[in-house]
């Protein structure tokens, strides 16, 4: 039996031989089957290596990003590592009407991707507490003595200087931003206060502090900063990574392209304080106006800005509507309501000769107070006595005229222009009174449900005051709920409901409002949005440095890709060599029996075999 030696290109010690009988299947396989098997083997091999490369490259990146987001939330409550030279710092002083607060922020080195924002977070001291300090009174109290402002604010700056590493002072930006209290001052007094700050602070502190770093910001700016801060903490400025993330189509303001882009849906904010109410949300689509007058008003309410570090990139360009309504806060609204009761009651008594509200025995019946509670309104030396009837529906009806709604389309409170909201694809967060009204007493903060809220509010209003006091004494309400909250909860519930549904025109079946005090267990201040916006160009420095390093390490990436292609090519060459060798074996196997048969035939005829192997 013949044997076939296989040596190929292997070393001599690897040479071996096989018998055709021992491997009949391989040698008897037809050409088409061999070709199909070989092609399939090559395809499977290439597919395998492609999957391995893609999983290693992109799968790891996705896992790393998810892990980094989780890690960021965990480390966000850890003490800031002040020994890390790659940590940068920023300081914002919020000069409000009742006092001033300093916030110290920090962020690691930018990752070099021009599409990503700085990862700014609040600095935490050795005890893991946020680096914040507040002083009183408000800065506007120094309107007549501006030369004392620097001394007034020095304790805040000294506090910040103690926490920011000394070596970082000269590269740490300082922003002093004044809000409501300063807005009401004459421009000359505002200028004198800011001038004193700009003159004295650089003498005593080494922070980055230029003329544009101290200013009185408008209510619109404050609202935009608050919107930026909330959405940054929610991660709405990040790239889309999961298919289940809420997205929205956006027409980029100022873009030459008319095509809409798809990006993460941002959240709107509703904030009802004691004096005012504010709404802010992104307007993703280009808006139209009912009149030229409405267009002029809209220009003052719409803000277009770029959060990215490259002004030519439109990925982080946003169009945000911001409107602030003075007198529509919870306490201010109650005051307006009582003023109306007082004026109307005095006038009716005078015209009709009645004594309503003038004595405790003949009180004015107030549907917006809990059942049987007694209260008083005192103005100009006169007193109007009230007694609650706890009628939530009547209370809502009574306060509806205070919305000052008009018949004009696309308007809200006081007839102010409001762009359309896509209620089926939107999300809002309600802060301050929106949260207090739903949580402090009713204990239903979080996801808002109009039907459940109105039922709970009706039940509360219709409950006797004596029972409410008993529940309060037993500690059944939130720890920070006081008697003032209990007394005016009925009114504020009705006011919040009317502002939200009638004033801002949210449908009663709207399910995407979340009332909250904090976001991810953090109280988000507008100052976070302010420093995000004002430091947006700082990543350019890190991006340039990253590009320089990348140019020196580019060959590594090229080598990595080249090696994979080289390996695949070698694999195909070896596979082709094996295929050709098998074909050669098959031809030899077929020719050998044919030659043997011919030689035997010649021998049987007694003739010499022609061209037989081994003959001359």
From Swiss-Prot:
It comes from the Eukaryota. Its cofactor is Ca(2+); Mg(2+). Glycans are attached at residues 404, 407. Keywords: Calcium, Cytoplasmic vesicle, Disulfide bond, Glycoprotein, Golgi apparatus, Hydrolase, Lysosome, Magnesium, Membrane, Transmembrane, Transmembrane helix. Its EC number is 3.6.1.15, 3.6.1.6, 3.6.1.42. GO terms for cellular component: autophagosome membrane; cytoplasmic vesicle; Golgi apparatus; Golgi membrane; lysosomal membrane; membrane. Ubiquitous. Highest expression in testis and lowest in bladder. Disulfide bonds join 368-395, 461-490. Residues 1-33, 581-616 are cytoplasmic. Residues 55-559 are lumenal. It is an enzyme of class 3 (hydrolase). The keyword Calcium applies. GO terms for molecular function: CDP phosphatase activity; CTPase activity; GDP phosphatase activity; GTPase activity; nucleoside diphosphate phosphatase activity; ribonucleoside triphosphate phosphatase activity; UDP phosphatase activity. Belongs to the GDA1/CD39 NTPase family. This is Ectonucleoside triphosphate diphosphohydrolase 4.
């Amino acid at each position: 039996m013949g044997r076939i030696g296989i040596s190929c290109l292997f070393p001599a010690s690897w040479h071996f031989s096989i018998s055709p009988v021992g491997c009949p299947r391989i040698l008897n396989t037809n050409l088409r089957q061999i070709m199909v098997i070989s092609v399939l083997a090559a395809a499977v091999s290439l597919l395998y290596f492609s999957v391995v490369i893609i999983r290693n490259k992109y799968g790891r990146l996705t896992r790393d990003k998810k892990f980094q987001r989780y890690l960021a939330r965990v480390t966000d409550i850890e003490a800031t590592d002040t020994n890390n030279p790659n940590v940068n710092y920023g300081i914002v002083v919020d000069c409000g009407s009742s006092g001033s607060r300093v916030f110290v922020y920090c962020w690691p080195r930018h990752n070099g991707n021009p599409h990503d924002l700085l990862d700014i977070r609040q600095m935490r001291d050795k005890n893991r507490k946020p680096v914040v300090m507040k002083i009183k009174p408000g800065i506007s109290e120094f309107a007549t003595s501006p030369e004392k402002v620097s001394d007034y604010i020095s304790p805040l700056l000294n506090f910040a200087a103690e926490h920011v590493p000394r070596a970082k002072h000269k590269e740490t930006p300082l922003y002093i931003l004044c809000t409501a209290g300063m807005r009401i001052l004459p421009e000359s007094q505002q200028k004198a206060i800011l001038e004193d700050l700009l003159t004295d602070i650089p003498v005593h502190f080494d922070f980055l502090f230029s003329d544009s770093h101290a200013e009185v910001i408008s209510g619109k700016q404050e609202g935009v900063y608050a919107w930026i801060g909330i959405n940054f903490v929610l991660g709405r400025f990040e790239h889309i990574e999961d298919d289940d993330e809420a997205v929205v189509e956006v027409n980029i303001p100022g873009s030459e392209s008319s095509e809409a882009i798809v990006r993460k849906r941002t959240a709107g904010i509703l904030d009802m304080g004691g004096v005012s109410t504010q709404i802010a949300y992104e307007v993703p689509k280009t808006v139209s106006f009912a009149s030229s007058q409405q267009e002029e008003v809209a220009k003052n309410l719409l803000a277009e800005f770029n959060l990215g570090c490259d002004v030519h990139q439109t990925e982080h360009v946003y169009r945000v509507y911001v409107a602030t309504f003075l007198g529509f806060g919870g306490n201010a609204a109650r005051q307006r309501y009582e003023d109306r009761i007082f004026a109307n009651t005095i006038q009716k008594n005078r015209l009709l000769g009645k004594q309503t509200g003038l004595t405790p025995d003949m009180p004015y019946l107030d549907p917006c107070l809990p059942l049987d509670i007694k209260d008083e309104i005192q103005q100009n030396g006169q007193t109007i006595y009230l007694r609650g009837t706890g009628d939530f529906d009547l209370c809502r009806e009574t306060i509806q005229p205070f919305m000052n709604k008009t018949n004009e389309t696309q308007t809200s409170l006081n007839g102010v222009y409001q762009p359309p909201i896509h209620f089926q694809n939107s999300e809002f967060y309600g802060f301050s009174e929106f949260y207090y009204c739903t949580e402090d007493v009713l204990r239903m903060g979080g996801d808002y449900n109009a039907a459940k809220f109105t039922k709970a509010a009706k039940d509360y209003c219709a409950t006797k005051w004596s029972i409410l006091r008993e529940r309060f004494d037993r500690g059944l309400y939130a720890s920070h709920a006081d008697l003032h909250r209990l007394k005016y909860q009925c009114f504020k519930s009705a006011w919040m409901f009317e502002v939200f549904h009638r004033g801002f025109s949210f449908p009663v079946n709207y399910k995407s409002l979340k009332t909250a005090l904090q976001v991810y267990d953090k109280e988000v201040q507008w100052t976070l949005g302010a420093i995000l916006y004002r430091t947006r160009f700082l990543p350019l420095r890190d991006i340039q440095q990253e590009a320089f390093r990348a140019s020196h390490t580019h060959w590594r990436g090229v080598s990595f890709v080249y090696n994979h292609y080289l390996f695949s090519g070698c694999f195909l060459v070896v596979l082709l060599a094996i295929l050709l060798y098998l074909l050669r074996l098959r031809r030899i196997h077929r020719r050998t029996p044919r030659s043997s048969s011919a030689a035997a035939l010649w021998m049987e005829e007694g003739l010499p075999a022609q061209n037989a192997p081994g003959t001359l």
